[in-house]
UniProtKB/Swiss-Prot annotation:
Belongs to the FlgH family. The basal body constitutes a major portion of the flagellar organelle and consists of four rings (L,P,S, and M) mounted on a central rod. A lipid is attached at C19 (S-diacylglycerol cysteine). Its main location: membrane. GO terms for cellular component: bacterial-type flagellum basal body, distal rod, L ring; cell outer membrane. GO terms for biological process: bacterial-type flagellum-dependent cell motility. This is Flagellar L-ring protein. InterPro entries: Flag_Lring. Keywords: Bacterial flagellum, Cell outer membrane, Lipoprotein, Membrane, Palmitate, Signal. GO terms for molecular function: cytoskeletal motor activity. The keyword Transport does not apply. It comes from Pseudomonas fluorescens (strain SBW25).
Amino acid sequence: MNRYVSVLALSGIAVLAGCVAPTPKPNDPYYAPVLPRTPLPAAANNGSIYQAGFEQNLYSDRKAFRVGDIITITLNEKTQASKNANSQVGKTSKTGIGLTSLFGAVPNTNNPLGDGDLSLSAGYSGDRATNGKSSAGQGNSLTGSITVTVADVLPNGIIAVRGEKWMTLNTGDELVRIAGMVRADDISTDNTVPSTRIADARITYSGTGSFADASQPGWFDRFFLSPLFPF
């Protein structure tokens, strides 16, 4: 008996452990800054007016376009979703049978109780109806800015960027992570790009600490909210 109790206890702990969301940790290698693949050769400072180390093409600008360059992303995300459903199903049926004779004979319809004549007629009626309503709504808003690095440049000129920002507050840590693809034409002259212009964007806003823990249900509540709960 004790063995079965131990097995059930361990199974319950495993189920509850699977319901716990993973806590984000800093220094994720995926979001680490990306450095240039090959270092640029050092240019000799051999001129007082012109130096090769600070040369720039006549038609180029200071926008990020190489691996390891820095670019600032302006976060301006706002989503609003709602859904309503209303369904009604109904069915009505009615059946009546009227008989005046039974096998060719007319039975005696006198009621011995004196409440009227008896009849062979019969009837049936039934109604069924089902109504269902459901509604759901969700809204999110995220504003701010984060500076990331260029992780890769595709052959067609699309720039892959990713990075993260951690902020340590009195009650815990807050983080913002972002990764996606940016067109070079969408980068403004001040080397910024809005988050709405990022393709395949992966934006994460989370945190740790007392505030984040307070928003999470306890282990007992997670047990009843688990999809494995039979009721």
